[in-house]
Amino acid sequence: MSHWLGVYKISNEEEGIICAKKIMSLKENLFLLQEYCSGHDFRIVVLGDKVIQAYERVPFQIIGNGYDTIETILKQKVASFQLAGRDKSVDSSDSRIAKNIARQGYTLQSVLDPGVVCRLQDIANLSLGGPTADKTADISSYYQHLAIKIAQSLNLKLCGIDIIAQDITNPDNKDYTILEINSAPGLDNYVYEGQQQDNYVKRLYSMVFDFLEKM
């Protein structure tokens, strides 16, 4: 399924049954169950023998301002995504959003105090509204070498390696889980955040093209 449609974090048997029925309604006859791995979600992009990008993917969340309801802030967020040309798979009526709001003791009509964070998705993904936090300048040598070794073992010149870890900037933190290796990683995760980030994405693609020309 694309854009994380039909992907759910299940906390108990009852939720599992509900989610299974939702997936079946999408005419899917195959279920993939995966063990939940705790930690933060990172992607490390390798080009040749170098890490050119590393960032943390944060689940979609909103921050209270003391006067707007969760529903109002959510709709404003979705509207801003669409105005910027960001993927429209961010849907304010997504049942997973309602579940997360309720899990934290709120409703759509709740007004959060200024600075209070309400997580709306469990999944840390750009297509579901999640922001990113750049770690390229801070990733530890341990995780750089790990990512490069993985890419080389698969004979991939360009790839994105998805890792769950507590902190890829801490060289002493070596507890991690490899989620996925993507042989065609997108590099435009910052492009919606401003002109400076847009220029950064263009530089990344220039690096890739220069590398390919020299092969």
Name the predicted role of every residue range.
Residues 132-141, 152-156, 165-215:
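C-terminal active-site "lid" helix and adjoining low-complexity regulatory extension at the edge
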Residues 47-49, 58-62, 67-70, 163, ...:
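Generic preference for flexible, low-structure residues
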Residues 3-8, 53-55, 97, 101, ...:
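Generic hydrophobic/packing signal
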Residues 26-27, 78-169:
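A long amphipathic alpha-helix within ATP-dependent nucleotide-binding catalytic cores
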Residues 34, 161, 179:
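Active-site flanking residues adjacent to catalytic metal/cofactor-binding acidic residues
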